[in-house]
Amino acid sequence: KSLFDSSEAAIKRVMDVNTTAHFWTIREFVPAMIKRNSGSVIAVSSMAGMTGTANLNDYCASKYAVVGLMESLEGQLYNEGARGVHCSVICPYYIDTGMFAGVNPGVLPLLKPRQVVNAMMHAIEYGDHFVTCPWYLQSVVYLCRLLLPYPVVMHCFKVLGVLDSMNTFTGRKTKQE
């Protein structure tokens, strides 16, 4: 949905669910991890937290915020000497669940939930700080932004289907629908 067609309540709900909830969860559980100097904090962001997607403004903003929160938390833990508490942020592409029903994934296939779970488990086991799923998307996004002028990046995203991926989006149907 266009930013200009999104209600204030809908935007607030997306931010509360996707971003604010991370603050409350971290505040609740991480102090005990700091005390033990042990634990893993895993936050789920999205590739939309690395690359803006047309008609997904609120969602992208909420997922970019998660990336920033986790980087900031990691810095705070480092400064406090809690080096045994590991932070990981997972940025998956579209996952084949009802949440993204109708989405057009472009040239990439939808991810299976198991692929994302495996990436999370790998992050916990090996202390990965930033994980994209599929793994190569992080490099693709960063290299495009580093090497190409922004209008060319936007054209690439258009050709790859990223900018039009939400045009056919319907989302999960609720019982009321």
Identify the residue ranges that each predicted region occupies.
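Substrate-binding pocket helix/loop in short-chain dehydrogenase/reductase
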Residues: 2-3, 7-12
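A short helix-coil junction within the Rossmann-fold of NAD(P)-dependent oxidoreductases
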Residues: 28-37
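Residue(s) in the substrate-gating loop at a strand-loop-helix junction
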Residues: 46
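Active-site-adjacent segment of SDR/Rossmann-fold oxidoreductases
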Residues: 51, 72-85
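C-terminal helical subdomain
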Residues: 89, 105-142
